[in-house]
UniProtKB/Swiss-Prot annotation:
Protein name: Thiamine transport system permease protein ThiP
NCBIfam families recorded: PRK09433.2-5, thiP
Keyword entries, A-Z: Cell inner membrane, Cell membrane, Membrane, Repeat, Transmembrane, Transmembrane helix, Transport
Gene symbol of the encoding locus: thiP
Classification via SUPFAM superfamilies: MetI-like (SSF161098)
GO terms of biological process kind: thiamine transport
Length: 543
């Protein structure tokens, strides 16, 4: 077989790969730099009074932001340790695989949907309140405030910590378990001598990761905060622009949020990151010996409690959604308009995220300079330094000097959501692209296959499934986003999360429950597509 050099250039052409990667980095730099420039100009203007804006209110909000993140992180990890230990010990526990899959759902659900699930269980009219009435001890739990924030954050982050801890358990050598069985070690001795050293090494990075997720939690605090006493920096930024329209206050809050985020990332870099294997299905434990009856009973109770804590809010979303008048809801034009808008914006953001991520991955593989390759490799992750609400606030302040910010809302929602999905898309695409390049580069060079022909005939079959995974994941993230649309949303641009927030704000709880079910089904369907693509890709690789 012979091939003539293609005249058309593309992402697969060696000459254009670094250029395409540079353009992708320029996109991220413009998005983040534009927001920082706007904030700097606003702060440097005559109307910014540092003493007036860095006041007791700001420091009170900052203290609460740190306090709720510390409490959420410690509680999430504290509850995760016995659950992970029990799941690892009970290798043949019925439904163990389903429980691990269930523990992957909280991060896949949009935060607004999960919050409604939490309120359906722990709210004043929730399941716990109904059970207490039936038992003759009526109670009205208050879900709004610090209690609700902690419950929701544990729901999101405890399953993540469990999966990360299971990955740490997998690193324990077989010889340690064999020796423990031969010596007849009890549960406490095994934990102290074998398990705890491995857990202790994983704790700093794991707590730091959960802390970062809680500090940048916007939707959960916005809906469950319950008032000024339970306000974080990101929610305060939103309130200062959306309700008070106080750009100077927003600048002070944004700089504080940015400084806190940078400090957390620095600490994470010093302490190390948790193993990425925790995000995948864990293998069967290689443990020798069986637990004693009392230990097994304790393990079963712990697993059941962990399962109920995660499963009940998800079931609450389904039950509440099905009790809503879905027929009437789906007959409303605004609902279909919101669905269409969400799908259009999500599709555009996912397409942009995959294209830019491919450009970075291809540029990294084609670059021979190690430093430049490292820039391409880490460039997408650097955008995580700036939370979406910070980028949105910066551009909102910048655009108001030139045009109506709400006119630019679709563009801002697409670009910010695409940028936030890029770190995950790069992680999914990089292994497949590097593998395909190592297999085919030499042969394609000898045959003169390059440009669009190489991309179509050689590279695309290898990266098709990872691209589908990245696209579905990015679209699901965009569908459930509320951070950017909360700033730029209006009657002219209504997405499903924005409409859901409006219905919650007007106390139309049944409508909100129905919309939450629709949004949750859409996002979970996309996540299932990505998961199936990953599974089929793994099977094809093993064959």
């Amino acid at each position: 077989m012979t091939a003539t050099p293609a005249r058309r250039t593309s992402l697969a052409s060696p000459a254009t790969k670094p250029v395409a990667g540079g353009l992708a980095l320029a996109f991220l730099a413009t998005l983040a730099g534009g927001a920082l420039l706007a904030l700097a100009l606003e702060a440097g203007g005559g109307g910014f009074d540092a003493a007036a804006n860095f006041d007791t209110y700001l420091w009170r909000v900052a203290r609460f932001t740190i306090w709720q993140a510390v409490a959420s992180s410690l509680l999430s990890v504290l509850f995760a340790i016995p659950i992970a230990r029990a799941l690892y010990a009970e290798a043949r526990f019925p439904g163990r695989g389903l429980i691990l899959r269930l523990f992957a759902l909280p991060l896949a659900l949009p935060a607004l949907v999960a919050v409604l699930g939490v309120t359906s269980i722990y709210g004043r009219n929730g399941l716990i309140a109904h059970i207490s009435d039936m038992l003759g001890h009526p109670m009205q739990p208050d879900i709004y405030g610090i209690a609700g924030i902690l419950i929701a954050h544990i729901f999101f982050n405890m399953p993540l910590a469990v999966r990360l801890l299971l990955a740490a358990y997998e690193s324990i050598p077989d010889d340690h378990w064999k020796l423990a069985a031969q010596l007849g070690m009890g549960s406490r001795a095994r934990f102290r001598l074998i398990e705890w050293p491995v857990i202790r090494r994983s704790l700093p990075g794991m707590i730091g990761l959960v802390f970062m997720l809680c500090v940048t939690s916007f939707t959960t605090v916005l809906t469950l905060g319950g008032g000024p006493r339970a306000t974080t920096l990101e929610v305060a930024i939103y309130q200062s622009l959306h309700f008070d329209f106080d750009p100077a206050r927003a600048v002070a809050l944004t700089f504080t949020q940015l400084a806190l985020t940078l400090l957390i990332l620095l600490i994470l870099r010093l302490t190390g990151r948790p193993s990425e294997e925790g995000f995948t299905q864990t293998a069967t434990p290689r443990r020798y010996g069986s637990p004693r009856k009392t230990e097994r009973l304790f393990n079963i109770i712990v697993i059941a409690l962990g399962f109920l804590y995660v499963a009940l809010p998800i079931a609450g979303v389904v039950v509440s959604g099905l009790t809503a008048d879905l027929v009437r809801l789906l007959s409303e034009r605004i609902v279909w308009h919101a669905i269409a808008t969400s799908l259009a914006l999500g599709f555009s953001a996912a397409l942009l995220a995959v294209f830019l991520s491919l450009a970075l991955v291809a540029a990294r593989e084609a670059t021979r300079n190690a430093r430049i390759a490292n820039i391409f490799d880490t460039g997408a992750s650097l955008i995580l330094v700036m939370p979406p609400i910070v980028i949105g606030a910066g551009w909102f302040i910048l655009l108001r000097h030139f045009t109506d910010p709400f006119v630019m809302a679709p563009l801002m929602v697409v670009t910010v959501n695409a940028a936030m999905a890029m770190p995950f898309a790069v992680r999914l695409l990089r292994p497949a692209w590097d593998t395909a390049a190592s297999r085919h580069n030499k042969l394609c060079s000898q045959l003169g296959i390059k440009g669009f022909n190489r991309l179509r005939l050689i590279d695309w079959p290898s990266i098709r499934r990872p691209c589908g995974m990245a696209f579905a994941f990015a679209m699901a993230l965009s569908l459930g986003d509320l951070g950017t649309i909360a700033l730029f949303g209006s009657d002219a641009l209504v997405t499903l999360p924005y409409l859901l927030l409006q219905r919650m704000g007007s106390y139309r709880t049944f409508d909100a429950a129905g919309l939450a079910l629709i949004l949750g089904v859409l996002c979970l369907a996309l996540m299932m597509i990505a998961d199936r693509a990953a599974a089929s890709r793994k099977e094809a690789f093993l064959q």
